[in-house]
């Protein structure tokens, strides 16, 4: 029998916590990235922060779209970092390690999000 807290399982609560973390990272990217872009820096952070915030919100709503938005932003991050520094592992590591680690956690939440979507659909609260 799974651990339950209220009507949610532990994995659902952890998924929601991950959604909050992604929202906070996305907000930081948008706010600090806008400042950086105004100073003439890369607009990557603003462009990447928007789907992070949206993805985190969708994860809080229990929708798989949130996970796929994050994974899309992760793919954009990989392309950007390759364009920025090439194939140098020393330069790629700080750009890709954290987002990829979060991406692995997000990918692991997809079955949980699907279960949450199915339960919501069965209740009729789309």
From Swiss-Prot:
Subcellular location: Cell membrane
Primary location group: membrane
One GO cellular component term noted in the UniProt record for this chain: plasma membrane
Protein name (record): Glycerol dehydrogenase small subunit
Transmembrane segments: 13-33, 41-61, 67-87, 92-112
EC class name: oxidoreductase
Top-rank taxon, per record: Bacteria
Source organism of this protein record: Gluconobacter oxydans (strain 621H)
Catalytic activity line of the entry: glycerol + A = dihydroxyacetone + AH2
Keywords: Cell membrane, Membrane, Oxidoreductase, Transmembrane, Transmembrane helix
A GO MF label: glycerol dehydrogenase (acceptor) activity
Organism phylogeny: Bacteria, Pseudomonadati, Pseudomonadota, Alphaproteobacteria, Acetobacterales
EC number: 1.1.99.22
Membrane-protein topology: Multi-pass membrane protein
Function: Catalyzes the oxidation of glycerol to glycerone. Also acts, more slowly, on a number of other polyols including D-sorbitol, D-arabinitol, D-mannitol, meso-erythritol, adonitol and propylene glycol.
